[in-house]
Amino acid sequence: MCDPDRPWTRREFLKLAGQAGLLSTVPTLASASAALNPDTVCISILHTTDLHGHILPTSDYDGNRDRGGLARCATQIRRWQRENPNSILIDVGDVYQGTDVSLRNKGALMIDLLNQLEYDAWVVGNHEFDWGMECFERALEQSNMPVLAANTLMEGKPAGEFPDAKHPFAKIQSFILKEIAGIKLAIIGVTTPGMPFWLWPEFTRGLDFRNPVEPVRRAIASAKKGGANAIVLTGHMGLKTRTGGDDFANTVMALTSEFPEVAVFIAGHTHQDVPSRLTNGVLFTQADHFGIHVGRVDLLFDRNSKKLLRRDAMCELMDKHFAFDGAVISRAKSQLAESEEALASPIGELAETLRSRSEPGRPSNLEKLIGAAIMETLSERNVPVDGVMHGSFGDTAELVAGPKSVRDVWNVIPFENYIVTAQLSPEEIKISMDEVFATHENRNLLGFAVKTEGRGGKGKIVSMTLANGEPLDRNKKYVIALNSFDARSGGHHFMKLRVFLERPEAHCTLHPVQTRDALIGYFQRHKVVRRIAAIRPLASAA
């Protein structure tokens, strides 16, 4: 048997593909080898991840426009399926949250498109729960294909063992076993175990997300018992951007180290383009986000022995060279038009451009605006607060002066985070904000006058008063508003804050209003919005 990971030279590849007459159509050596040798079979696994409701093109993180979207991915997926009918199609999670068109139908359009494209499975992602359990359960019910999350307990039952076959949870499985051209291929799916550090508990009611190592061990045993000739692991998790290692939400290194027999790990969650690399001897690949890349894995097997001979992976950039799939556009056309009209709706005017760059203790003008909108929205609901902790989602975000539309607010606040209030002492507020400043996360405290010393992760609060200069009473509690994501630790960043909020005396409360809607409403009420000099508290201390 040939080494499945031996690097081939360009000359060897061109020679082999040329002999097969497939230079213009076959992307990998495994495909070329199968075309040339009838004693081998190539199975292709086509994959998308982190689509986040994007049907049409968007911009990438470098500002390049006209990239991605499921409509383009579908064009390439169909092309690859024509090239190799021995194909499996999967999505690795975060399917529907992220666009207005998807929010309007609570993800139903995206699941419908997965059904129409005949995906074989999709993996549960963390953003599947941003709109609550009812939306997630409807997505399960609507799916024609299994949904994978081997490391999830549903009311205490492992994936694939939920007793009520009519309940949506019964759709969640540990793996699928597909027989193609005589080869049995198991695809095991896991989700990130980091859910509790992002999501309000009510949004994942009845579900428990475990470290995936032992669930994967059980799934591999079951798959092998079912006759699997090869194991593919796919997970809504990736490698950490800076270190390439694991953390509370990503366990790729642990899984590939524990299960080196896995043929390939198809990743997601971290929004990275990783065409092909070896991780602990396991082929690793990840197809970016928003459909900006679509991925393909080719596994070459010997037909008789059913042994894996070679494995290749690649990702294709979905730019202007790829047309939109007609069926996808036709099916989504009316809802896309409805969304476009809503996004273009005017909400008011901004008198001057507001930028997001800030320093610890020195909130940006954009942060001040968001804080004022949250504070005023809560006041209208008879929930006065003393301050707001919030950020502006990056240093480059800005609101440009002029007429504003709903789309402008979406660009500033892309997530459906709810508003949370809690009662904290001055000491708890100081400890929490010192922790926030140490993380390099863009957050500030609005409604208070905060003085700091040091820069970056070394910034510390040296004094804090109310915005009018009045000193804080250490024996009183102050009502602070923040978003639901930060209230759960902001992705493991604000663990001290989380501990304070979980104490009964904090009276931590989730309010049924989202931060984006608060900012839209602020524009609609004020008509012309001007730069905010300072935010004044709308409450007395508790």
For the regions a protein language model found, what residue spans apply to each?
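Acidic, metal/ion-coordinating pockets
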Residues: 2-321, 365-376, 388, 423-424, ...
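Catalytic centers of hydrolytic enzymes
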Residues: 39-63, 68-78, 82, 198, ...
